[in-house]
Regions:
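Phosphate/diphosphate ligand-binding glycine-rich loop within oxidoreductases
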Residues: 37-111
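NAD(P)-binding Rossmann-fold cofactor-contacting core
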Residues: 151-168
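A charged, well-structured terminal subsegment
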Residues: 99-124, 276, 280, 284, ...
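N-terminal glycine-/charge-rich "phosphate-binding" loop or analogous flexible N-terminal tail
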Residues: 1-41
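Rossmann-like adenosine-cofactor binding region
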Residues: 163-257
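Short acidic low-complexity segments
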Residues: 25-35, 48-49, 170-185
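Glycine-rich NAD(P)-binding loop of Rossmann-like domains
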Residues: 110-144, 171
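Rossmann-like dinucleotide-binding domain for NAD(H)/NADP(H)
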Residues: 81, 213, 219-303
Length: 303
């Protein structure tokens, strides 16, 4: 097994962490040098710069899945490539929960009454308890979302490409049954990974079957759904609310209709962020480097 020289672009390693990696036999480089053969990076940097980068033996991306990188690229021919699954589960589940509760607790209304200096008690707050929730995609993030919502007493069903057992959902259905059943849910959360099978899966026809009181949340890639249809449904008030963290164009152009929708909350691709991620990222990287040096399969390995 060749020795590794690591460039960590995404995570600034502290002296203690560098010392731990050194004990494994991994040298840390502060810059991208020609003899670097291991990298921890975001997908976008790799996608844009692979042609100019050295050939790698070890690659870990700072995302759960990979949808931006060509795994067959010559610079990755001999590389073991993995993701950082498990790092972002908790912040993303809390993101979804906080925004759904914000709708049910009328946070936007009360924020406006405070700005207007108006005392307007509302009796229209709702509980998450008893609501029917569909979690589409039961990977680690979707499972954490289901766990979080079930704790609040919601009736959670899961939709997944393959059968899976989970104590946090009442029932697991195949993705193919979404068209028949999606209209019954008051909250729909999309947590799917993007690939050839899932691109456009939240189709025009499927979106039009959403319940009129549905809160629709997408923390997967924007390519999973038809944005134009969602805009139409929100403009015409045919669904209650939407929460979006990813978009077909980022940054979102100022002329985009999403900016002016009153029944939409949008955030700039930050649902995964948390200062607690930093330690989880290092532990994920450390574990995978350790497995690589032991010639064992990495966690969340893609090739």
């Amino acid at each position: 097994m060749e020795k590794l020289k690591l460039y960590s672009r995404f995570l600034m390693l502290n002296p203690s962490q560098i010392e731990q990696l050194s004990a494994l036999g991994v040298t840390v480089s502060k810059t991208m040098e020609p003899d670097v053969n291991a990298i921890f990076s975001d997908q976008f940097f790799l996608e844009s710069n692979l042609d100019q980068l050295p050939a790698f033996a070890f690659v870990q991306v700072a995302t759960s899945g990979i949808d931006k990188i060509d795994l067959n690229h010559p610079k990755l021919a001999k590389a073991v490539v993995s993701g950082s699954r498990g790092v972002f589960n908790k912040p993303m589940a809390e993101y979804v929960l906080s925004h759904v509760l914000s709708v049910y607790q009328n946070h936007r209304f009360f924020s406006q009454t405070q700005k207007d200096q108006q005392w307007r008690p509302s009796r229209h707050n709702e509980e998450l308890n008893g609501k029917k929730v569909a979690v589409i995609g039961l990977g680690q993030i979707g499972t954490q979302v289901a766990k979080t919502f079930s704790f609040f007493g919601a009736h959670v069903d899961g939709y997944n490409r393959t059968p899976i057992d989970s104590i946090y959902v009442k029932q697991v259905y195949p993705l193919s049954s979404l068209a028949e059943q999606i209209s019954q849910y008051e909250v729909v959360v999309v947590c799917l990974a993007l690939n050839r099978d899932t691109e456009g899966i939240i189709s025009d026809a499927l979106l039009r079957k959403l319940h009129p009181k549905a809160i629709f949340v997408n923390v997967g890639r924007s390519e999973l759904l038809v944005e134009a249809t969602l805009i139409e449904l929100l403009q015409q008030k045919k669904i209650r609310y939407a929460v979006l963290d990813t978009f077909s164009k980022e940054p979102l152009p100022k002329e985009h209709p999403f900016w002016t929708l009153e029944n939409l909350t949008m955030t700039p691709h930050i649902s995964f962020t948390s200062i607690q991620n930093l330690e989880r990222m290092f532990q994920s990287l450390y574990t995978n480097l350790q497995l690589y040096l032991q010639n064992e399969r990495l966690i969340n390995q893609f090739k």
